[in-house]
Amino acid sequence: MLASGMLLVALLVCLTVMVLMSVWQQRKSKGKLPPGPTPLPFIGNYLQLNTEQMYNSLMKISERYGPVFTIHLGPRRVVVLCGHDAVREALVDQAEEFSGRGEQATFDWVFKGYGVVFSNGERAKQLRRFSIATLRDFGVGKRGIEERIQEEAGFLIDALRGTGGANIDPTFFLSRTVSNVISSIVFGDRFDYKDKEFLSLLRMMLGIFQFTSTSTGQLYEMFSSVMKHLPGPQQQAFQLLQGLEDFIAKKVEHNQRTLDPNSPRDFIDSFLIRMQEEEKNPNTEFYLKNLVMTTLNLFIGGTETVSTTLRYGFLLLMKHPEVEAKVHEEIDRVIGKNRQPKFEDRAKMPYMEAVIHEIQRFGDVIPMSLARRVKKDTKFRDFFLPKGTEVYPMLGSVLRDPSFFSNPQDFNPQHFLNEKGQFKKSDAFVPFSIGKRNCFGEGLARMELFLFFTTVMQNFRLKSSQSPKDIDVSPKHVGFATIPRNYTMSFLPR
């Protein structure tokens, strides 16, 4: 009896060893994860990271471990990609494998995998296809949306003239303008600039954007499972997100009550009609939760990124008055002072185009991109990334890649001009990301940036309360987003 028991134990031991050897051989044949600092239990590599400067911390680690490395953000294992080559190889050359969406802990509190931006699989595919088609139907990429942007630019010019050249904080002047463009698409109408609810919504969006870029926001990315139950600034961020969700839900309810299926007024109507068409489809992704969350995606994404870029842009132009002077000269020569700028003017304005590109490159609004996730076991270079591995494509490292930009730390529009003064494209210009999950609002954002910058510069000179040499263009926060410092300025009529 004893002998048979020992034989059974021996067989189990042998079987266990064989299984472990088999797993080890498979891992060995597939390869290993990229190198990285050794993590501690639960806290991961927290001790090697500065949450005040997360982007810089990760770039510092890449100096030791190379352009592809593994980091543990608390219990989260993330593979980080640095530089043009690594990011493009992953997001373009292996686009399908890297097209999953990773975690964005603060936003996940409200979105929970719903909506077009933070979803995965068939849901992401269906909602993205629908959103792109519907935005196109409502004029994005066509003359219709250009007229809407021009109209809103006119409201902005009137508001800035109304300041009488006084020193102002431009933050909400710009965010009101940008937000009204996406509002006209998703809600069917613009807000009055004095609308208190509108201003409250803009403050909510700015507050969330800023929180995700602070030290606490980055700490939450690591330890959300614990911090979501604790008091702290994250609870205020949750309240802001909830306030935005409630506002969108209220808008959706209004549209449901007043819907005419034969005459959609806006994005919400179009989604509601699609819901009716698919109500008998058990696998449909067109239901109320995805409508509210997709609308919220568009509202936040269509407001904060462009308005932050404008805010950074005016600061950079005041820092570099020689650039502002050249912009004025080109506008006066190509457009003049009497007619409104058109998007087609862009083709004749290489300097303005270079300036806007350089503002986006230098401003680097989303430096670590939205996290990706590999959809299946993936071989990348000499490494093996198991299915579900999260990936940070460091867009900022591409925008500052010295192989493409001669002085990447400096603001210099020459980065996008050839020796003849003609605009030149760059493969490393990736502020909208690249690949299958790039920003599908890129066309709208490009049109807004050109028309808003050009219209403002046609009508005003920019004046800072500081001399150019004293203007600080380093960011206030760098986390999920890059947040420029608060500043005041005057818009002086030309």
Swiss-Prot record:
Location relative to the cell: Endoplasmic reticulum membrane; Microsome membrane
Residue sites binding heme per the record: C439
Impact noted for substituting R372H: Increases phenacetin O-deethylation activity 2 fold
Induction (record text): By phenobarbital and dexamethasone.
Any single biological process term in GO: coumarin metabolic process
Presence of the UniProt keyword Membrane in the record: yes
Cofactor entry: heme
Keywords: Endoplasmic reticulum, Heme, Iron, Lipid metabolism, Membrane, Metal-binding, Microsome, Monooxygenase, NADP, Oxidoreductase
Reaction(s) the record says it catalyses: 1,4-cineole + reduced [NADPH--hemoprotein reductase] + O2 = 2-exo-hydroxy-1,4-cineole + oxidized [NADPH--hemoprotein reductase] + H2O + H(+)
Effect noted on mutating N418D: In allele CYP2A6*28
Record protein name field: Cytochrome P450 2A6
Organism: Homo sapiens
